[in-house]
A protein has these predicted regions:
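Juxtamembrane intracellular "pre-TM" segments in multi-pass secondary transporters
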Residues: 1, 189-223
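Helix-loop boundary and gating motifs at the non-cytosolic
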Residues: 1-50, 221-226, 230-244, 248, ...
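Glycine-rich segments within core transmembrane alpha-helices of 12-TM secondary carriers
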Residues: 50-53, 136-161, 353-364
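Helix-to-loop junctions at the C-terminal end of transmembrane segments
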Residues: 53-70, 269-283, 371-375
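A membrane-interface helix-boundary motif in multi-pass transporters
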Residues: 71-76, 159-175, 369-397
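C-terminal ends and interior cores of transmembrane alpha-helices
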Residues: 77-98, 292-309
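Multi-pass alpha-helical transporter architecture, strongest
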Residues: 90-96, 179-188, 389-414
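C-terminal transmembrane helical hairpin of 12-TM major facilitator-type secondary transporters
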Residues: 285-335
Length: 414
């Protein structure tokens, strides 16, 4: 089991690194060189690939990558994607957002696309290498690796960016994909005898039908609606976090050295507490606690916006928000895993994560428009405060849906 946990830790790192480099850190790069909030918001649509991965998940179930597939179907896909991500990140490092924003966008899209395919294969591998009772530990290990990657791709990248050109920073980050390749090497891939090898249209249709058959039309529809609204607040707020810190007068080194370090420690605590809650509470109760925590901690950012730059206060609030994010991350992985049939592992998990991500990613594209609008009708500080009031309110529908589901279909985590 220890080798499985270590492998998932390294693969979690490989998942988190490209995602942050085409999302949060890219937002900081763009804002740092003077790109508008509106354009930065639209850039977040590049990572819609993570929300649409159910469309190409059947390929991961059906086909093996030539040469790479000798390692195993899942491991072959993961390693192939890691090589492609490395190349795409190098392409980003060769781009100049001021002279050719489109060129940067193309390579960012490629990194996001292959990052999403990598996630499909990693999720499938994680589900297949252990039974349900061990999924909480694997999810926590994956989240730990993911959060370490976030620290590296944000904190370390920001500190370097104060001393080096952003393009050199991305060159260095691309090399770190080797960590994920080590995770592939030490991971053992079992043979999944339950998997159904289907055409893409068959896989999507049958996995969808299987989900509704197992839960019933009413419960399945309720679950999909709950999943699609549960992460709205933090996903919509995400693209604007780095621009917000910079607009409030904090330096890249301050953000990287203190704020993001606190964020990692808090998120690690959050996902281990999430694992504890999964084992000791109803899964729906854990979902409710996580959703409420995200709503409250997001509101705290409005306090930062209304006060003068205070690094200690920002670190505290980022810590609380990161704790909530880690909590929700682990709980959400366990929740989605509990809904998946092993017959359609990759496709069904990708479908559910897509339902979780797609609404938030769609609205996050307008996050810069919203922030620019609020700033234009008030002041910089007041406008940002209004923005966080708006994102916090986005958690309310999910909390109501969880209570409806909890009252009628409460389930225990096993």
């Amino acid at each position: 089991m220890k080798q499985k946990l270590l492998g998932m830790l390294l693969l979690g790192f490989a998942s988190g690194l490209p995602y942050m480099l085409v999302f949060s850190t890219l937002s900081a790069w763009l804002r740092d060189v003077g790109i508008s909030l509106t354009e930065i918001g639209f850039f977040s649509w590049l990572v819609l690939t993570y929300s649409l991965k159910f469309l190409w998940a059947p390929l991961v179930d059906r086909y093996s990558i030539p040469l790479f597939g000798r390692l195993g179907k899942r491991k072959g896909w993961i390693l192939f994607c890691q090589f492609m991500i490395l190349i795409a990140l190098l392409g980003m490092s060769a781009s100049d957002p001021i002279k050719s924003l489109q060129f940067l966008a193309i390579f960012a899209f490629l990194a996001a696309f292959f990052g999403s395919v990598q996630d499909i294969a990693i999720d499938a591998l994680r589900i297949e290498i252990a039974d349900n009772q061990d999924q909480g530990n694997l999810a926590a290990s994956y989240q730990l690796g993911y959060r370490i990657a976030i620290l590296v791709a944000t904190s370390l990248a920001l500190i370097f960016a104060d001393q080096l050109d952003w393009r050199h920073v991305y060159q260095f980050m691309s090399i770190l994909m080797i960590v994920g390749m080590l995770g592939v090497i030490i991971s053992h891939e079992p043979i999944n005898k339950e998997i159904a090898i289907l055409r893409m249209d068959e896989a999507l249709l049958l996995s969808f039908k299987d989900f509704f058959h197992r839960f019933g039309i009413w419960t399945a529809a309720l679950l999909l609606l709950l999943i699609s609204t549960y992460r709205l607040t933090d996903i919509v707020m995400g693209p604007m976090a780095m621009p917000f810190y910079l607009d409030m007068g904090f330096t890249k080194t301050e953000i990287g050295a203190l704020v993001k370090t606190v964020a990692l420690a808090a998120s690690i605590a959050g996902f281990f507490v999430g694992g504890y809650l999964i084992k000791n509470l109803l899964l729906t109760t854990a979902l409710l606690a996580g959703g409420a925590a995200v709503l409250v901690t997001n509101l705290f950012f409005a306090l930062v916006a209304n006060l003068d730059a205070n690094l200690s206060l920002l670190s505290l609030i980022v810590g609380l928000d990161s704790f909530a994010a880690g909590l929700v991350g682990t709980i959400n992985i366990a929740f989605l895993t509990s809904l998946v049939s092993k017959k359609y592992t990759a496709v069904q998990y990708a479908m559910l994560t897509s339902f979780m991500m797609l609404p938030g990613k769609f609205f996050s594209g307008f996050s810069g428009v919203i922030a620019d609008y609020y700033v234009s009708i008030s002041s910089l500080q007041t406008g940002w405060a209004y923005f966080f009031y708006t994102t916090s309110a986005m958690s309310i529908p999910a909390l109501l849906l969880i209570m409806v589901y909890k009252n009628s279909h409460a389930t225990h985590s096993s």
